[in-house]
């Protein structure tokens, strides 16, 4: 009997994400996928995907109630891969401000999630991104590849500098809707996208395949 060589990915189910869409996309990319909030399963998986839709404050509340904040922190402390999508990326920053109300995020990266600075909000539809050289997340993708966005809030400024030359600075990918905003981050074991790779056709499939390939 042959043992499966597929990487095990948990889609963390805390009530605020397109978990079924993510499950199908990851399975098509070759992963063994489970949707769960079970602590041990989430901790032991090769990769943990944290989706997110809706309000920053509601997502943070749901994540904490499911102990997801602790799971993410412990996985990253051990160098275990985590990927956030949409609001699942936003909550990795210091804070979010919605309608003047500030909510603390997971504080993995400095920065504030605020309203998009654009004439048309939400930003809904397909857009290109500007990925940095050396990106593993966007490997094999053309510069004109388009990804699907749907959001009203974003991070417009990146302020994390790495003073230690022995440490690799995070790779930040940008997109523009009115004003440039952070579209993706690659930071050691922690990767995240503002767009929805599971809804981004062939480009999104390649991106998820790239992530799974690093697990």
Curated annotation (Swiss-Prot):
Localization in the cell: Cytoplasm
Biological-process GO terms, alphabetical: L-histidine biosynthetic process
Residue ranges annotated for the Glutamine amidotransferase type-1 domain, each copy included: 8-215
Domain of life: Bacteria
Catalytic activity: 5-[(5-phospho-1-deoxy-D-ribulos-1-ylimino)methylamino]-1-(5-phospho-beta-D-ribosyl)imidazole-4-carboxamide + L-glutamine = D-erythro-1-(imidazol-4-yl)glycerol 3-phosphate + 5-amino-1-(5-phospho-beta-D-ribosyl)imidazole-4-carboxamide + L-glutamate + H(+); L-glutamine + H2O = L-glutamate + NH4(+)
Pathway: Amino-acid biosynthesis; L-histidine biosynthesis; L-histidine from 5-phospho-alpha-D-ribose 1-diphosphate: step 5/9
UniProt entry keywords in alphabetical sequence: Amino-acid biosynthesis, Cytoplasm, Glutamine amidotransferase, Histidine biosynthesis, Hydrolase, Lyase
PROSITE patterns, alphabetized: GATASE_TYPE_1
Active site: 86 (nucleophile), 196, 198
GO terms assigned for molecular function: glutaminase activity; imidazoleglycerol-phosphate synthase activity; lyase activity
EC number(s) reported in the record: 4.3.2.10, 3.5.1.2
Protein known as: Imidazole glycerol phosphate synthase subunit HisH
């Amino acid at each position: 009997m042959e043992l499966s060589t597929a990487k095990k990915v948990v889609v963390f189910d805390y009530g605020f994400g397109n978990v079924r869409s993510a499950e199908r996309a990851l399975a098509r990319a070759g992963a063994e996928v489970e949707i769960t909030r079970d602590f041990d399963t989430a901790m032991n998986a090769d990769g943990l995907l944290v989706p997110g839709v809706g309000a920053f404050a509601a997502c943070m509340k749901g994540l904490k109630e499911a102990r997801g904040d602790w799971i993410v922190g412990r996985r990253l402390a051990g160098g275990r891969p985590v990927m956030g999508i949409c609001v699942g990326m936003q909550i990795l920053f210091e804070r979010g401000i919605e309608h003047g109300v500030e909510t603390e995020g997971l504080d993995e990266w400095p920065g504030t999630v605020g309203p998009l600075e654009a004439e048309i909000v939400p930003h809904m539809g397909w857009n290109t991104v500007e990925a940095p050289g050396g990106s593993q997340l966007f490997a094999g993708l053309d510069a004109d590849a388009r990804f699907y966005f749907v959001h009203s809030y974003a991070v417009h400024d990146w302020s994390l500098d790495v003073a230690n030359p022995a440490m690799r600075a995070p790779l930040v990918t940008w997109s523009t809707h009115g004003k440039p905003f952070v579209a993706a981050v690659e930071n050691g074991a922690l990767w995240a996208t503002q767009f929805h790779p599971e809804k981004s056709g062939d480009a999104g499939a390649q991106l998820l395949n790239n992530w799974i390939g690093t697990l």
